[in-house]
Amino acid sequence: IDKLNTTVDSVSQNDDYIAIRVAGEIPRYEIFCSLEHATALWESLSDKTRATNSAYWDYLNISNGLPFIDSNTREEFVPQMANMELINGVSFEKGCYTGQEIVARTHYLGKQKRRTYPIKIISDTPPKAGDQLATGTSTENQYTGTLVNVYQTAKNEYEALAVIQIKAAESDKLKLKDADAEITVLELPYPLEDQK
């Protein structure tokens, strides 16, 4: 690709490649091409870029508030809970998909009670996607949030994305439901729309 677009969500393409600019301060691209072209591209970029592992890519997604829903959390959330409409992950203007009526109703009636937030966790027990969050006032069978993605940043320290009840995220009483942990809600790199 001769020239890559730098605008978030923009697409650059030629006959051999398609590259999509991913959100975040550090420029990242998802590149789609054949294996043959991927090998050539890798060699041409090796002196201009720094290779990292997929875990670092996951960390950058967490840092940029971009959730990745996997088998631990699928079918747990409507798109708005994962902030999808805020990161161009869902459109209310077009498309047809399973559950669209519920998603649109939630959007247009403004009854959103949960959102995705970045959090910092300090815990001796490693947290994982799908773990539940609670508050000090939660009963044994209640939970106020679910971990979506987790990345270990240091010994016993983690950054994560979690879908959390808006009221619970505004309190200072979050905890992992099944482990002793200190949890701090961090700021998203994009604004949440009016939380009705």
Residue ranges and their predicted role:
Residues 1-13, 67-76, 193-196:
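Short, low-order "capping/linker" segments at domain edges
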Residues 11, 22, 65, 95, ...:
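Residue-level recognition of beta-strand microenvironments
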Residues 34, 70, 165-167:
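Helix N-cap / beta->alpha transition motif
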Residues 1-64:
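Acidic, low-complexity central loop/insert segments
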Residues 38, 59, 66-69, 109-111, ...:
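Short, catalytically relevant binding-site loops at active-site mouths
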Residues 53-54, 59-85:
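Short, conserved active-site entrance elements at the starts or edges of catalytic domains
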Residues 82-90, 104-196:
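Glycine-rich, small/acidic residue-mixed loop/short-helix segments
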